[in-house]
Amino acid sequence: MLIQHARLVDAEGEREGDIFIRDGHIAAVGAGLAAAGGEPVLDAAGLVAMPAFIDLHTHFRTPGFEHKETVETGSRAAARGGYTFVNCMPNTSPVCSTGAIAQSVMDEARRVGLCDVNQCVSITKDFDGRTVSHLRALPKNLRFISEDGKGVRESKVM
């Protein structure tokens, strides 16, 4: 697919240009690109193309508060806004203090398939402000911890 005449915005600045996509990946970016025979062409004049966004503080509310937001509705909103990675806070019910809870959210996000989702785990077990032993049992793919608005009040806990 060839996207032509888009306003390209990136770290280098703004310019009009084209984007050639092959096999679902950007193969070329530049001005005056030509479509291969039979490739669809999209005229993006008046539209903006830019790198995806990352949101490090989201609330998908799973588990326990799905009446506010689910992994699917949150993923849809993120993707629609141009976000390809979101990081969900652990203030859920139960509090996301285990690898199993975090993994279930991330598995659901993979099933939905709209953006990459990381589920934070609480710094202290169930936001109790003291217990951190649960962190030793976390799998390596859990990359972020947060007390999300609670704060850790004791320096020796940190």
Residue ranges and their predicted role:
Residues P40-L42, I54, N87, N118:
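Hydrophobic/aromatic beta-strand patches that form the interior of the parallel beta-sheet core
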